[in-house]
């Protein structure tokens, strides 16, 4: 989805940003959907 791409672009592709990416996804959807994992 475009929202996920925007989150990834904003956080970059560094593995150290994984928690920040997951927090953004959870904030967007209210949970972390299986298809995102």
Curated annotation (Swiss-Prot):
Subcellular location: Cytoplasm
Cofactor(s) needed: FMN; [4Fe-4S] cluster
Cofactor remark: Binds 1 FMN.
Gene3D superfamilies: NADH-quinone oxidoreductase subunit E
Cystine residue pairs: none
Gene Ontology MF annotations: 4 iron, 4 sulfur cluster binding; hydrogen dehydrogenase activity; metal ion binding
InterPro entries: NuoE_N
Keywords: 4Fe-4S, Cytoplasm, Flavoprotein, FMN, Iron, Iron-sulfur, Metal-binding, NAD, Oxidoreductase, Plasmid
EC numbers: 1.12.1.2
Chemical reaction(s) catalysed: H2 + NAD(+) = NADH + H(+)
GO CC annotation: cytoplasm
Family: Belongs to the complex I 51 kDa subunit family.
Subunit structure: Tetramer of an alpha and a gamma subunits (flavin-containing dimer), and a delta and a nickel-containing beta subunits (hydrogenase dimer).
Name recorded for this polypeptide: NAD-reducing hydrogenase HoxS subunit alpha
Native organism: Rhodococcus opacus (Nocardia opaca)
């Amino acid at each position: 989805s475009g929202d996920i791409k925007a989150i990834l672009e904003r956080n970059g592709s560094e593995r150290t940003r994984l928690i920040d990416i997951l927090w953004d996804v959870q904030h967007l959807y209210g949970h972390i959907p299986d298809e995102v994992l």
